[in-house]
Amino acid sequence: WPGGEVGQFAASAGPVMASSNDFCITIKGKGGHAAMPHNALDPVPVACQMVLAFQTIISRNTRPIDAGVVSVTMVHAGEANNVIPDSVALRGTVRTFTVEVLDRIEQRMRQIAEHTCAAFEATCEFEFVRNYPPTINSAKEAELARRLMASIVGEDQVLVQEPTMGAE
């Protein structure tokens, strides 16, 4: 595991790995020539507003003690430097340790996507895929694993496993 030394083990009770979830949002506008933007409905500014608004979800829509990550990792739009594209695709990942926080993030992302598009007279397709739930170790089994590890490598080589936003 990253950060661990050879011969060390780690285990802890509670959340240890985040849920893994993917999203794809396709913003639909109306393409046109860049010299005549008034004849188009440019989806690029819509996408930019949306990405910025997503950054407020964790800081303003979840409790400060609840961990979560919203990462927009791919933005695809257009093929030419003088043409306003018809659409923009945003893709990324969402990570959390609880289903409740995940529900809230998905709800807010959908609202932000739909309302941002409406404000610009664009439309969107919103896809959210829940791939894996969070890994949450029970106290009893985590303690059993720690005792077994300690019997093999010694108690000083068994560390507390910090939660990670990495996933299964």
What label would you give each PLM region?
Residues E127-E168:
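An extended, acidic, His-containing surface patch that forms the Zn2+-binding/catalytic region
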Residues V46-N61, R108-F120, L144-I152:
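Generic non-transmembrane alpha-helical segments
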Residues S59-V69, N82, T116-E127, E155-P163:
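Flexible, glycine/charged-enriched surface loops at secondary-structure junctions
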Residues N81-E106:
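A conserved active-site cap/scaffold subdomain adjacent to cofactor or substrate pockets
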Residues W1-P85, A167-E168:
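Histidine/acidic-residue-rich, glycine-tolerant segments that coordinate divalent metal ions
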Residues P37-A40, V44, R95, V99, ...:
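Hydrophobic alpha-helical scaffolding
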Residues I25-I27, V88-T96, F126-R130:
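Short, hydrophobic beta-strand segments
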Residues N21, A80-A89, I112-C124, S138-E141:
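A glycine-rich, aromatic-flanked flexible loop/lid motif
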